[in-house]
């Protein structure tokens, strides 16, 4: 098996570079085959080298490239395009274009990541606006695809239509669903509900039913029920829904832990249920679903949460490695026709 080389933006995210380099170590130790993965790490020497000295395993499997600049969390995309060409994010993305790496992962500024990726890599044929896409678990022991998760806050009906096409292709390529059920996220299932843009997108998808299995609207309350394979939303709604779902998982865990420690009886019950609850919570643990692919780009770009710790970042790295190894982009291009 050939070696997969992944570019890593070591300076992106709230806890960089510690969470990034620590995440690479966790990925190498627990999630990946060390023998066929290497990393090109882009960042500031003064901050990254001490981390590499701390994590010897990462140092052995990586090449460090010193980059003088950083894309800041409050940088506007236009500013990043003009002024951040020497940043760790830019150089990491550019390594894909130059054929040095097969994918990139970053916890940095989402808008800047999208803008730089579009500028440097370009988009796939007939795709105007890439979207952030990931696979999430449902209660039915199956996964579903949701997009957009924050790349495009304000979308036209045609953009939502393209997201549906890309999500459909992603579900076929990644989840191996032969005929994905696609739905638009809305406040109700009736055709009259929603904004003008949502209703227009509904009509576009209804007209394309010969090429896409469109199932109409889906409400957030039914999103995790396993009824559909692809959920389409604008970046604002998609991002809000994702973060609410993640917070509910953490709240449920916290409430359960408090409940089982309230008395002797509940503590005993908690011990009896501990392994089962832990196993079930892990299915919905947001950390293991960190890492969303920017679909529609001419290259594998994976966005990690800005507040990701090392475990969460490690799972984003796994997403990038698997996407590159399985040549996901080629499969999506094939599905797009």
Swiss-Prot record:
Its EC number is 2.3.1.274. Keywords: Cytoplasm, Lipid biosynthesis, Lipid metabolism, Phospholipid biosynthesis, Phospholipid metabolism, Transferase. GO terms for molecular function: phosphate:acyl-[acyl carrier protein] acyltransferase activity. Pfam families: FA_synthesis (PF02504). GO terms for cellular component: cytoplasm. It comes from Ehrlichia canis (strain Jake). It catalyses: a fatty acyl-[ACP] + phosphate = an acyl phosphate + holo-[ACP]. This is Phosphate acyltransferase. Pathway: Lipid metabolism; phospholipid metabolism. One of its GO terms (biological process) is fatty acid biosynthetic process. It comes from the Bacteria. Catalyzes the reversible formation of acyl-phosphate (acyl-PO(4)) from acyl-[acyl-carrier-protein] (acyl-ACP). This enzyme utilizes acyl-ACP as fatty acyl donor, but not acyl-CoA. It is an enzyme of class 2 (transferase). It is found in: Cytoplasm. Belongs to the PlsX family. Homodimer. Probably interacts with PlsY.
